[in-house]
């Protein structure tokens, strides 16, 4: 294991500016159209101008280096991770190890506002967190896997994640229930596609369209109904998923060679998948939750490491027959689980499906704002949810131990 520092690369910055200055933009957008057709071209030109004239890569590198970076070998791969230990004032507190797992099109940048909220002690709380946040294989500074592997963890820890962090964390909880002490997620869902659970859910949801409260609680009805609106939104916003699952190297190659194309493709998701209403806004609502610096930090992590192609391959690997044969989607999660539910998750599973999947569900909390990238969008809310979940995890483990003795 060794420490990694992002380094300042003047030649690289000059090359990037040359590419940005010679961007070939398409024709102007349709009149009266904002983000309905994808990233708005007029706003993309403003992004390019900010990137060229206001975004200071060297200053951002200093910011990225404000958290300690390391690399280590895991299953033969060079894996990059942040390892943030508690503040010095926490010396008499119990240290809780937690693994934060990012998703796509995010990166470790998603956690920069969250991590300080976890490693800083809270008044009248007898524990604090030690955080490990890896770059997934093929993302950022982590080496891509030629053949997917499942390394056996040797320690015990808690896991938190949304987006791909949910799916990977869920699978870890199923595969290694003795190592994963508790699973916290901002995107709990049951994606078991076997005929019986799918048919049962379909019937419940269909009846719920006629009888309010049948399939979902009244306060959650807007998540599914009207069904036509929900279905249309899913079709509109999941095209990238099918493309990356079937032709990852094609889209990866296209994005690898165009910084402005990469920015548009990544930032589009931070617009539409944080709130569907953002499609109607000329700036895609991007600066409602994020700064342009934060969004460009994320783009730069992909651009400087040439990792977009290997990152999108994750979709193909997880939808492959080899992965499906592992039957993680069908297996129950038995470790203590806490679900933080946000209104604009990409895929909504009714609570009865969530309870079916997670057999030791200690908490479901519901919030009024936020989408697929909750830790990046709402770090304070996610931090509070994690802090609140730990005592419930400990209690569930203690009750399980008492019951088995």
Spans of model-derived segments:
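Glycine-rich "HGGG/HGxG" loop immediately N-terminal to the catalytic nucleophile
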Residues: 57-59, 124, 136-152, 170
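Beta-sheet entry/capping signal
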Residues: 79-81, 96-99, 128-132, 155-159, ...
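Conserved hydrolase catalytic core segment
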Residues: 117, 121-126, 155-220
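Alpha/beta-hydrolase-fold enzymes
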Residues: 207-265
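Conserved HGGG/HGGXW glycine-rich cap/lid loop of the alpha/beta-hydrolase fold
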Residues: 91-143, 390
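C-terminal subdomain of alpha/beta-hydrolase-fold enzymes, centered on the catalytic histidine
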Residues: 244-405
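Non-catalytic accessory segments flanking enzyme active sites
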Residues: 13-87, 294, 303-306, 310-325
């Amino acid at each position: 294991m060794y420490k990694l520092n992002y380094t300042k690369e003047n030649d690289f910055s000059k090359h990037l500016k040359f590419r940005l200055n010679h961007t070939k933009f398409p024709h102007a957008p349709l009149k009266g159209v904002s983000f309905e057709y994808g990233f708005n071209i007029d706003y993309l030109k403003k992004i390019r101008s900010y990137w060229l004239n206001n975004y200071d890569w060297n200053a951002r590198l200093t910011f990225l280096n404000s958290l300690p970076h390391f690399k280590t070998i895991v299953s033969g791969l060079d894996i990059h991770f942040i390892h943030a230990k508690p503040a010095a004032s926490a010396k008499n507190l119990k240290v809780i190890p937690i693994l934060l797992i990012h998703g796509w099109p995010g990166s470790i940048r998603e956690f920069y506002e969250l991590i300080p909220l976890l490693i800083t002690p809270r008044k009248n709380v007898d524990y604090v967190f030690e955080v490990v946040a890896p770059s997934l294989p093929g993302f950022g500074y982590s080496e891509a896997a030629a053949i997917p592997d499942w390394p056996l963890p040797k320690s015990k820890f808690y896991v938190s994640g949304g987006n791909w962090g949910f799916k990977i964390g869920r699978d870890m909880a199923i595969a290694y229930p003795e190592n994963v002490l508790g699973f916290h997620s901002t995107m709990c869902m049951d994606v078991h596609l076997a005929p019986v659970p799918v048919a049962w859910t379909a019937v419940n949801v269909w009846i719920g369209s006629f009888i309010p409260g049948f399939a979902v609680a009244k306060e959650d009805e807007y998540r599914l109904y009207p069904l036509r609106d929900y279905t249309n939104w899913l079709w509109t916003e999941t095209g990238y998923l099918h493309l990356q699952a079937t032709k990852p190297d094609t889209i990866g190659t296209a994005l690898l060679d165009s910084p402005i194309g990469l920015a548009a493709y990544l930032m589009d998701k931070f617009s539409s998948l944080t709130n569907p209403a953002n499609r109607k806004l000329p700036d895609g609502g991007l600066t409602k939750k994020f700064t342009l610096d934060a969004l460009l930090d994320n783009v730069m992590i992909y651009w400087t490491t040439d990792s977009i192609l290997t990152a999108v391959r994750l979709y193909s690997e997880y939808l492959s027959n080899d992965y499906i044969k592992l039957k993680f989607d069908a297996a129950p999660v038995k470790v203590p689980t806490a679900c933080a539910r946000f209104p604009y998750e990409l895929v909504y599973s009714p609570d009865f499906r969530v309870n079916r999947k997670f057999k030791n569900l200690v908490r479901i909390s519901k919030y009024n704002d936020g989408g697929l990238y909750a830790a990046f969008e709402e770090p304070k809310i996610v931090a509070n949810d994690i802090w609140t979940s730990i005592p419930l995890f400990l209690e569930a483990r203690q009750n399980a131990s008492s019951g088995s003795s």
